[in-house]
């Protein structure tokens, strides 16, 4: 199973499969055998000879594959062997129809998978019903064989002997019911194996046949096959009498050895109870149990019954054990009980009852080891049933949660009143002592001692009532109070979680602001240097502009002065200068 892969009822090996071939197998695995990849593109003459040769080489080089498929309308397992040359027989033949088949294969495969899931669910439900019906029939035939065995044993002891035709007819009837029971058990386990295959997706029934399952099937068949066979067979039975210790030898029937183990068939009752239980048949309960990892077995059903109706279960079990053990002791002791003490059914019931209750008066003692073994098992069962009865009675006498809560509330109210009364008595006696010692002219010492005595009694009463109140508060920690405490703790934890989330948000905001501030601080030297450079550049530009203005002003001034000089040197002389 570890090296195979299950998909839609087909077990395929994972080795020697390429991705394209695996996809092809998954597309059409329910209705068709697996096809090699060379046949998918086989469109008449559309493919080239080189491609066909390469595909044929790929098919011939791949290892043979054994595919186990389960059709929807066939319960048998089909084996198909595909190897070299399989492409020609299964290849696509229709000219250019390969692309159309590839486009429609996806929807077909999805429909087939959905149909396969629905078929499996319906098949599983049918197997459940068949298994339940087989278990019912097996219980009917098993109980029928036990009843006929008891009738035959009683009639052969008092009415006729083992060699009569009546005994032979009844034994043949027991054998027939046993054969039918064995057939039903085999078919039941076959249904179990089919359910295992459906649940685990296996196609080979041999996968479910583990050594443990084989052992339990063989053990069940062996237990149910034991029955008194037709015919008269005897053996010599030697025992020692209880009170006289004298040996007793008699000829006994082999049927007594084969009849008593037939009561082991009663295990079928537990199986029927399991299969008819609402916890086992209800899908919702099984789903919840699977989520909680609970096994729905006979033990769980018995625990549920002991929780729901413990008294009824113990009563039915005790009475059934009492009757069966009494008849078994009677059957074991009838050959060596000469005084008809334990071989009498009422006497055997008395012996079983005093053994079951662990009393043991000693007035009746079994003679054979068979009777002693039955009494031993009865004593063990009685001890267990007594413990269960004590537990059930204690649980029935215990107060419920609501009753405990009401009782604690009433006791707390009464203790509160007693505390108030005791405190009032203390105050009253204190006032009376003060009055009789300070507010009177003549002190009455007897009255003062009386009030002092009452004062001390009131103090002790107040202390005892407060102690009872503390004990009640300690005992009041029931599941209801624990639930309240749990709710309070849940609210506190929720509040703390909300505060922690708010605190985390604030921390995240603070971290964001700190990161922004750190980024600004890291960018500050660059901004400062850039600002200083800009200011220096502006200052230098301003200085250069003022210098240029000064230079131009000086140049213009020198030009104007030179012009004046030139004009004065080139001007004609006036009349005053000439005279």
Curated annotation (Swiss-Prot):
Keywords: Calmodulin-binding, Cytoplasm, Disease variant, Dystonia, Intellectual disability, Ion channel, Ion transport, Membrane, Phosphoprotein, Transmembrane, Transmembrane helix, Transport. It comes from the Eukaryota. Residues 1-54, 90-115, 551-579 are annotated as: Disordered. The keyword Transmembrane helix applies. Changing residue 30 to Q: In NEDMAB; uncertain significance; no effect on channel function. The chain crosses the membrane at residues 138-158, 168-188, 214-234, 256-276, 305-325, 374-394. Residues 412-488 are annotated as: Calmodulin-binding. It is a multi-pass membrane protein. InterPro entries: CaM-bd_dom, CaM-bd_dom_sf, K_chnl_Ca-activ_SK, K_chnl_dom. Residues 345-365 dip into the membrane without crossing it. Belongs to the potassium channel KCNN family. KCa2.2/KCNN2 subfamily. This is Small conductance calcium-activated potassium channel protein 2. It comes from Homo sapiens. The gene is KCNN2.
């Amino acid at each position: 199973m570890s090296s195979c892969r299950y998909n839609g009822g087909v077990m395929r090996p994972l080795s020697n499969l390429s991705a394209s071939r695996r996809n092809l197998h998954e597309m059409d695995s329910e209705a068709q055998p697996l096809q090699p990849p060379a046949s998918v593109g086989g469109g008449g003459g559309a493919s080239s000879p080189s491609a066909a040769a390469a595909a044929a080489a790929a098919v011939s080089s791949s290892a043979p594959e054994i595919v186990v498929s389960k059709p929807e309308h066939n319960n048998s397992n089909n084996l198909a062997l595909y190897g070299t040359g399989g492409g020609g027989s299964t290849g696509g033949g229709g000219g250019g129809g390969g692309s159309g088949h590839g486009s429609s294969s996806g929807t077909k495969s999805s429909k087939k998978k959905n149909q396969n899931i629905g078929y499996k669910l319906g098949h599983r439900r049918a197997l459940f019903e068949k298994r339940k019906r087989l278990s019912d029939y097996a219980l009917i035939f098993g109980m029928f064989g036990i009843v006929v065995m008891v009738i035959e044993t009683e009639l052969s002891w008092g009415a006729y002997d083992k060699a009569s035709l009546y005994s032979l007819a009844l034994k043949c009837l027991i054998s027939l019911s046993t054969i039918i029971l064995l057939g039903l058990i085999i078919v039941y386990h076959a249904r179990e194996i089919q359910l295992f295959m459906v649940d685990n997706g296996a196609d080979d029934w041999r996968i479910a046949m583990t050594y443990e399952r084989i052992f339990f099937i063989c053990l069940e068949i062996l237990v149910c096959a034991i029955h008194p066979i037709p015919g008269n067979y005897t053996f010599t039975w030697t025992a020692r009498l209880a009170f006289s210790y004298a040996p007793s030898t008699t000829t006994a029937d082999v049927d007594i050895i084969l009849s008593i183990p037939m009561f082991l068939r009663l295990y079928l009752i537990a199986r029927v109870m399991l299969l008819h239980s609402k916890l086992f048949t209800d899908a919702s309960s099984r789903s919840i149990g699977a989520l909680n990892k609970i096994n729905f077995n006979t033990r769980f059903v018995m625990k549920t019954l002991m929780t729901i109706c413990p008294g009824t279960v113990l009563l039915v079990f005790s009475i059934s054990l009492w009757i069966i053990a009494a008849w078994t002791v009677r059957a074991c002791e009838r050959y060596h009980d000469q005084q008809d003490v334990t071989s009498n059914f009422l006497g055997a019931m008395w012996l079983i009852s005093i053994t079951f209750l662990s009393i043991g008066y000693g007035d009746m003692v079994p003679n054979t080891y068979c009777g002693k073994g039955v009494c031993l098992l009865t004593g063990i069962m009685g001890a267990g049933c007594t413990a269960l009865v004590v537990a059930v009675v204690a649980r029935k006498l215990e107060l419920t949660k609501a009753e405990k809560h009401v009782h604690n509330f009433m006791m707390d109210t009464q203790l509160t009143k007693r505390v108030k009364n005791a405190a009032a008595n203390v105050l009253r006696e204190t006032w009376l002592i003060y009055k009789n010692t300070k507010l009177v002219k003549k002190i009455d010492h007897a009255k003062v001692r009386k009030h002092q005595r009452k004062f001390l009694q009131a103090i002790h009463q107040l202390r005892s009532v407060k102690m009872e109140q503390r004990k009640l508060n300690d005992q009041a920690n029931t599941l209801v109070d624990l639930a309240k405490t749990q709710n309070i703790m849940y609210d506190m934890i929720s509040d703390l979680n909300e505060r922690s989330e708010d605190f985390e948000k604030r921390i995240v905001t603070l971290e964001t602001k700190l990161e922004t501030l750190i980024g600004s601080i890291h960018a500050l030297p660059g901004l400062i240097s850039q600002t200083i450079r800009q200011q220096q550049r502006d200052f230098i530009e301003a200085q250069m502009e003022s210098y240029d203005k000064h230079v131009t002003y000086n140049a213009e001034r020198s030009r104007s002065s030179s012009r004046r000089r030139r004009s004065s040197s080139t001007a004609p002389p006036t009349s005053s200068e000439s005279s």
